[in-house]
């Protein structure tokens, strides 16, 4: 995808995507690269796919401070700090590389924000797999979505559960922001049985 959302879950997160980029910049690969970083909502989970995504981002966007090289202790730490929400001097102190052409925090923040996922981040409330007792009212837990521009955005659900009829029902959830960016689609499987 070419953005900071390395695991393609719809959100760039310091403790997954940021650490993957930092470890990759240190030269780690395979299990050493991914150990403890794959979350339950990660879409890309294999080391080969993650490394391919990292190679793309590393080559096209990894030189955050513009000094001509991608360095774990400058670019990697800048990204990690940015994803943790640090700004201003707290973002840049001690990590801008030698020969950097981009040194001001505002310019660095602008560059990194341009590579944030643009679509809303959506997540299910509750489980993706639900067992429901037939002939009782089904109350769906729904989903929530947030967007970098719009904040909380409306979630659209398709599908329905007929709690009077045994079977498996699939509900789908998605969201869109005011700029027309559409989230990934999440599903919930509801099995109605006696």
Stretch-by-stretch model annotation:
Residues 21, 79, 124, 143, ...:
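Extracellular/surface recognition and adhesion modules
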Residues 130, 148-192:
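Serine/threonine-rich, repeat-prone extracellular segments and beta-strand-based repeat modules
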Residues 1, 119, 140, 185-187:
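Surface-exposed or flexible loop/turn and strand-edge residues in extracellular/cell-surface modules
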Residues 4, 62, 128-130, 136, ...:
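Flexible, active-site-adjacent loop/turn segments at secondary-structure boundaries
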Residues 118-147:
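Solvent-exposed, low-complexity, repeat-rich "mucin-like" stalks and linkers
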Residues 1-119, 167:
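Cellulosome-associated attachment modules in secreted, modular CAZymes
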Residues 7, 65, 125, 144-146, ...:
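Residue-level detector of conserved, well-ordered beta-strand and adjacent loop positions
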Residues 27, 85, 144-149, 175-177:
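Extracellular acidic, Ser/Thr/Pro-rich low-complexity tracts
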